[in-house]
Amino acid sequence: MFEVKRNSRNIQEIHLQFNSQKDIRKLLLLSDIHFDNPHCDRELLKKDLDKALEDDAGICIFGDLFCCMQGAYDPRKAKGSLLPQHDGPNYFDLVVEEAVEWWRPYANNLILVCPGNHETAIMKRQEIDLIDRFTTMLRMVEPDCNVSAGGYGNWMRVYCAMHGGRNSFTIYSH
């Protein structure tokens, strides 16, 4: 389907091989999912991700997979915005563990997950990298998963090759 080369945390290459001009390769590009927020439409998200599986599409998340505004020291917190399954003294662990289980069916299609302003705020206030923890745990439970944790400002170069010829395009996220 695709080969991923990680040049650094902020620079990745995706190599797509095409056998004919009729070949189609798809990428699902997502951002601002806020998975742990009660307002996240998980039903619609599942529908989109199931379609990506059906199409054998690569999946990239460009920031704010998590909301995670209910932790200690977060001035934005409001316990009314906390899902019951995340109500515990290990709030961040509960959020990431649930996310890993929920995303397992899509693990082999996940290419890249980048932090957004929510995850970088958590790193600043709580000294925990939710994206690195999520991608590491996903690779542990799904041996064929090759997802990378990207950077806040991220460059992804997509190379499309067919019969010795090659074309490319760049996706920048911030």
Language model region names:
Residues 5-9, 146-151:
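A short catalytic or substrate-binding loop motif that flags glycine-/basic-rich loops and adjacent residues
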Residues 25-35, 167-174:
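Active-site-proximal beta-strand elements of phosphoester/diester hydrolases
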Residues 109-111, 152-154, 167-169:
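Generic beta-strand structural signal
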Residues 115, 160, 171-174:
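Short, structured patches in soluble enzyme cores that scaffold and shape functional sites
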